[in-house]
Amino acid sequence: MRCFPQLTAAALLLATAVPGSAWAGATFNKTLQLQGTNFQVQSSGEGSQQQLTITTTGAKPAIKPIRQTVNGQVVGAEVADLNANGLPEIYVYVQGAGSCSYGEVVAYAVIKGNEPSPITLPELTGANAEGYQCHDQFQVVEDCLARRFPIYKPGDSNAKASGGQRQICYKLKAGEAGWLLRPTSVDKF
């Protein structure tokens, strides 16, 4: 299954690396809404660390604000209900500094009550990690979180991968200690 064979130009722009000089004072500010809950996602700061703040309105009971430091720049955010439980999740995409631009997802599930529950994205391992050298792109597509990145072959430069693209679709599952994004399908093209 291909979650998104064609990325829109806007999604590509969100996922591109930011040159070092553009990092000074970089900010992100976006309001998202799902199932009656509004999420305000903001980041600010200088250098390779940003302060991420997520606040909500409309949830009953009110959800506690989330504040954390992220390594990189916030480049996008989406809300979804990947597990179809009637409660939204927030997915924030962070791009690391430097030419490699490692991607990270900071995500939280709204649970009954006012404490947001962290969602964990596992490290790439095994065959999924073969040829991986960063340049991640993330996007919610239907009921999965899709992660796409170029595949590098031995001898490829950081600027030119020759092995195509790998896309991994993750489904949201309940784990023993919280929510997990588990890989359910992998495509190469």
Regions found by a protein language model. Name each.
Residues 65-66, 117-125, 181-186:
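Beta-propeller fold detector
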Residues 23-72, 111:
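Flexible low-complexity loop/turn motifs enriched in small/helix-breaking residues
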Residues 44-45, 93-96:
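Beta-strand C-termini and the immediately following turn/loop, strongest in propeller blades
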Residues 34-35, 80-88:
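Residues in Ca2+-coordinating acidic/glycine-rich loops
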Residues 3-8, 13-17, 22-38, 44-47, ...:
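Acidic, small-residue rich beta-repeat scaffolds with periodic aromatic anchors
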Residues 51-62, 102-122, 169-175:
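Beta-propeller blade repeat segments, especially FG-GAP/WD-type strand-to-loop junctions
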Residues 67-76, 126-133:
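Repeat-based blade/solenoid architectures
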Residues 97-100, 157-159:
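Short glycine/serine/proline-enriched coil/turn segments at secondary-structure junctions
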